[in-house]
Amino acid sequence: MSDARWAEVEEDVAAAAGHLARSVELFGAGGFAGEGLEAYKARMAFMHSMQSGHTSLESALVRIMDLLGEEPPIGRDWHADLIRRAARAIGGRPAILPAGIAEAAHETRRFRHVAMRSYGTFEPTRAEPSAAAAGVLAAGLPDAIAVFRRGIDPDG
């Protein structure tokens, strides 16, 4: 499938991987404790990079579904439904995301909710699984999408 829209998918995937890789670095750098400006910047930088990374991942998945003529999920739980659907084969297309990548995406989705709704109660120890999931996605998402693309369009 030589559809030029793959360029935007690839940009979204690269953005997701880049933001999530930086999230891992930011989490490792720490400095979250305290009420001073540096602690505030550390917390906000980590939460925003996680939010940006996951949002870029969702954008890539929606673009892929658009390319395939598949309607993306709608409704209150569309964010979770998007990952669940991408993790399974539907209507002749293979799963877009392998199980481990989908599991990590669910974790970053969960954390994005924290970043968007509960940022005042950020607890670094509770973010450890999310930072680990960000590492899984940063390392594995680009290859997972490339494998999917080759699977549906070996000549593309």
Regions found by a protein language model. Give the residues of each.
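Solvent-exposed interaction patches of small proteins and small membrane subunits
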Residues: 1-156
